[in-house]
Curated annotation (Swiss-Prot):
Known partners and oligomeric status: Component of the Mediator complex.
InterPro entries given in the database record: Med7/Med21-like (IPR037212), Mediatior_Med7 (IPR009244), Mediatior_Med7_sf (IPR044888)
Pfam families: Med7 (PF05983)
Similarity section: Belongs to the Mediator complex subunit 7 family.
Taxonomy, superkingdom: Eukaryota
Listed SUPFAM superfamilies: Mediator hinge subcomplex-like
Listed name of the protein: Mediator of RNA polymerase II transcription subunit 7
Subcellular location, record wording: Nucleus
Function noted in UniProt: Component of the Mediator complex, a coactivator involved in the regulated transcription of nearly all RNA polymerase II-dependent genes. Mediator functions as a bridge to convey information from gene-specific regulatory proteins to the basal RNA polymerase II transcription machinery. Mediator is recruited to promoters by direct interactions with regulatory proteins and serves as a scaffold for the assembly of a functional preinitiation complex with RNA polymerase II and the general transcription factors.
Organism expressing this protein natively: Anopheles gambiae
This protein's UniProt keywords: Activator, Nucleus, Transcription, Transcription regulation
Amino acid sequence: MSNAEAIQVSSLPLPPAQYINLYTDENIRKNRAPKPPAPIQDAYTMFGSPFSNDDNIIRPLESQGFKRLYPQHFDRRKELKKLNHSLLVNFLDLIDLLVHYPDSPRRAEKIEDLSLLFVHIHHLLNEFRPHQARETLRVMMELQKRQRIETAQRFQNHLEKVREMVKNAFASLPDLTDADRLAGGLEPMDVGESGDLAGGRGEGCHPLDRLMCELVDRM
């Protein structure tokens, strides 16, 4: 093997071994894969910070120890633009300090200002998450509704085709007029009280009846 061959190295870490060994296709098909953990009812820890189910999804900045830079009632789009401009200005100020006064104590202040601006930007973006979740749910439900309407329409089209096929099948059946005519041509015979045929076997007998009687006599 040549040493010049490139060694392929994945830029992503390998998947966890427990998922490979436990959640195989065979285990899932045989219902042997472990069940997902039950929902957490009480407090839990995420990224080293304690949380509770009773807490708000988006906690206020004051409860997290940050100073609020905008009022309680505001336009989020306008404030995000202002924070973005402030972030750019403070970043340029930090670059200017690093170039001209690298040992200035204002460098730490600018870094703190940048951190606070980033926190506020992320907080405003996170406040859009509930709206994003509702909008995602609305779009998903509209998609499901459209798919079900299309499925119902396809069923209706198939039903119309089946009805048309049944109608054509009935229309292609043979006409029963000849059979009805043949059945109507056989007149019923009158039977007297003694059980004999009315008129005997004389001229009043139907030709077909006479033919049938002759066939029976020959047997």
